[in-house]
């Protein structure tokens, strides 16, 4: 039987990044080398080989914990892929101190069950006047958290809502051999990451397939505090923690 443990720090520099440039150049962006990402963690590996009669058997397993962080971005925040099409713009970002490709959006704070909850969700401006935080909301829409407490809901209220990078990865392999015959099986697992479920942004087109989650959508007061009402207006239920 063998066992090993390793601590590692890997820094990746000068990654490719598409950066916006002035329009007078006739180009919208250019690819540059920018940014540094640090992967730090620990890895364990163990193996055991034995024999049963004429059959040789082996078990190998490994597990690793990794923390991924952007350490030298350059610009404060750069959008990466526009995942999900019309789900509120770019939701995969790169920023100093955050994991690479983190999901960026509004924090889900439940569902408006009735008009009174919408009317009670307010802020007071510098002149002492009260305003609705989500004036266009309807019962059944997502209530987004007003993080900065200023001027209602705006781009400054978006934050990191998920990490696509797994915290823990594991692998296990089993193998057996007898004379000229051998057999092996390998499994792999990743845990702790979030997945952006774009399919939850259900549109009104009849060509789309729906999952059983459609039956959990809000369809009246008290029916759901997680999934919003069905709506063809994607802006009313923009990307948020609900999509993770």
Where are these regions (language model features)?
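Surface-exposed loop/turn segments flanking beta-strands in extracellular/periplasmic regions
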Residues: 22-30, 81-91, 147-149, 204-217
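Outer membrane beta-barrel strand-and-loop segments of large Gram-negative receptors
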Residues: 4, 8-52, 141, 157-161
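Outer-membrane beta-barrel translocator domains and adjoining extracellular loop/strand segments
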Residues: 16-20, 71-76, 196-202
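Extracytoplasmic gating/loop element in the C-terminal half of outer-membrane beta-barrel translocons
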Residues: 190-244
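Flexible, solvent-exposed coil segments and beta strand-coil junctions
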Residues: 19-29, 148-155, 234-239
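Membrane-embedded beta-strands that build the outer-membrane beta-barrel scaffold
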Residues: 1-9, 42-50, 57-65, 170-176, ...
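Residues that define the transmembrane beta-barrel architecture of outer-membrane proteins
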Residues: 38-42, 55, 166-170, 244
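Conserved small-residue
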Residues: 32, 51-162, 226-227
